[in-house]
Amino acid sequence: FNFCASMRTFVDYTLIAANRKGNAEHDDLKTMTSQIFDELPEYRFFEKLRNYIIHYSYPFGTLRKIAPDRVEFFCMKNHLLEYDAWGAIVKKDIELMPEEIDIRPYIRKVFPSLESIYLMMYYYYAEDYCNANSILANLQKKYNLEYPVIMSENNADNKNKIIRPFPVKKIVEGIEMLKYNPFLDISFV
């Protein structure tokens, strides 16, 4: 349940924030989330599974101990299909699933899309983040404060410190690509 509720809350609040930012941003993000819903069965399954849990039943029907300290939970397809509020598309998705549904692979398939939504929101606020940095720098100058820098250390002795500017332009270019392909798997290194 926590994953379903967190996913739904994240998407809802992201749309609320985009709406506050402006109509174009909200429309872009709404289009993106609609496209993900239309094209990714795992995403729509979890979006509707939250409603199932809140309004109908706990979804797990089988528990298997596979190691002394590890268990696996499975949803039973026939139990899920007893719920009548899945909607036609998600109901068909569930009908195509195995009788015992291990949701872990479904979760893994949803994460790249959630990251895309997050990065799109970051893109909308990137200029604000940069402006905040300038405002902070101006305050530090005004009050004669030492200007902070973000540094990385190569060793524990505080030697070889490296100042790395944040590559905002490259990040913005990458996020811009998400408008056209929200299913890119972006791995952070």
Each language-model region and where it sits:
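Short, contiguous, well-structured surface segments enriched in hydrophobic/aromatic residues
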Residues: F1-L29, T33
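Acidic, Ser/Thr/Gly/Pro-rich intrinsically disordered interaction regions
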Residues: H26-V189
